[in-house]
């Protein structure tokens, strides 16, 4: 239980991370029809991420085929447990997050064809854990990390806190908040995914929450401001007993927020999450929001996204200033084999340590989106990843990943 005087902070995604949490596609999920494409895409995403930080990968307990595919793909000829490659401090830290009963495999310095592109000599580790899973959308069922600052170590002068930390007297810790995941408002089976945090992590590291919430439905600037929308958070099958005022009160309490910014407009056809904010508008700094903009008046999204843009333009920071806005281009209309439009979005990017990974769709606007984000984030490497396989099941890069932190 958290003391009422404990300070809570929901970090921004660009802050220093420990690892990216993911879940591998398996045959007994919605991916069955496209399993080979999906697995190839996941392997490619992991190869990119391990150039910048470690990956924690859940593989279903029944998916021995997937487990062997991952091991074969990432293990080098020299066994990763060889004494020539020592365990890092982060490897031990990550392993100790898990319940001892969870089957665990460590692949150190996993193979990545991208490593040379980013000037690295060795890749970060791949931590494989075996737990039952329904699906792969880790953003929505993964634990949400918050920073706690305990009262017994709070100093009146912030510089004193820094001194305490340097002296090894930690006054902060990370807690994993385990919200209920009910398959995006009872649309899909979610029993195993809802249980993953409890099954995987040591109980003293987690806190069970009393509301339904998906990670893709919120976005934090790390400075007490949360961006979300009414379409998702007020959808009846999530928290029907809670009003908007009550939901906002809980969000402020659980994440240590000063304000919640609510959008009421914007959607993507094919998004079955009820308009997750991570496909529409995202913080890229504490005072800057990147958002998708449709300029084709004939496109069905044009009016709703123009109204969303108008809402963003009138949002105010605590100092009364408007937020800086970065418009991202819209992809051409992309359809599946049944002629259904898919929710491709450049806003579904992923921050990793020192880089921004951006989904691409073999579209004429891919390079434009990468260039815009590179100009907006000059201190980050901006890297595109082909995510056409992911949107076949209505999600993209940010949807299949969840960041974890370490102080």
Where are these regions (language model features)?
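Long, intrinsically disordered low-complexity tandem-repeat segments
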Residues: 157-163
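Compositionally biased, flexible interaction segments
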Residues: 165-167
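Ser/Thr/Pro/Gly-rich low-complexity, intrinsically disordered segments
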Residues: 85, 113-114, 162
């Amino acid at each position: 239980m958290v003391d009422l005087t404990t300070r809570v902070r929901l970090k921004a995604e660009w802050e220093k991370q420990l690892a990216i949490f993911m879940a591998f596609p398996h045959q007994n999920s919605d991916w069955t029809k496209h399993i080979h494409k999906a697995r190839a895409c996941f392997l490619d995403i992991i190869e990119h991420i391990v150039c910048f930080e470690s990956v924690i990968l859940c593989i279903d307990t029944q998916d021995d085929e997937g487990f062997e595919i991952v091991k074969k793909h990432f293990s080098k000829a020299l066994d990763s447990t060889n004494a020539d490659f020592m365990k890092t401090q982060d490897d031990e830290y990550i392993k100790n997050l898990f319940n001892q009963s969870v089957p665990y495999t460590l692949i150190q310095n996993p193979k990545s064809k991208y490593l040379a592109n980013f000037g690295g000599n060795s890749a970060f580790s791949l931590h494989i854990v075996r737990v039952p899973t329904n699906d792969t959308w880790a953003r929505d069922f993964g634990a949400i990390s918050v920073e706690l600052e305990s009262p017994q170590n709070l100093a009146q002068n912030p510089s004193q806190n820094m001194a305490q930390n340097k002296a090894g007297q930690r006054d902060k810790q990370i807690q994993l908040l385990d919200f209920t995941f009910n398959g995006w408002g009872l649309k899909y089976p979610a029993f195993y995914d809802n249980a993953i945090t409890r099954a995987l992590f040591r109980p003293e590291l987690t806190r069970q929450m009393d509301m339904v919430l998906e990670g893709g439905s919120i976005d934090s600037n790390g400075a007490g401001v949360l961006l979300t929308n009414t379409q998702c958070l007020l959808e009846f099958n999530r928290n029907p007993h809670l009003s908007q005022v009550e939901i906002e009160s809980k969000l402020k309490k659980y994440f240590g927020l000063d304000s919640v910014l609510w959008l009421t407009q914007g959607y993507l056809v094919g998004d079955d999450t009820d308009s997750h904010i991570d496909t529409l508008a995202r913080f890229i700094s504490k005072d800057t929001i990147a958002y998708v903009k449709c300029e084709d008046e004939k496109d069905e999204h044009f009016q709703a996204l123009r109204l969303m843009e108008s809402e963003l333009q009138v949002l105010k920071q605590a100092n009364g200033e408007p937020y800086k806005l970065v418009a991202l281009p819209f992809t051409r209309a992309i359809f599946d084999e049944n002629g259904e439009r898919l929710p491709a979005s450049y806003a579904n990017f992923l921050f990793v340590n020192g880089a921004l990974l951006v989904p691409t769709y073999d579209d004429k606007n891919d390079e434009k989106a990468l260039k815009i984000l590179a100009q907006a984030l000059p201190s980050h490497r901006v890297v595109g990843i082909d995510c056409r396989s992911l949107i076949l099941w209505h999600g993209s890069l940010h949807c299949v990943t969840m960041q974890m932190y370490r102080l």
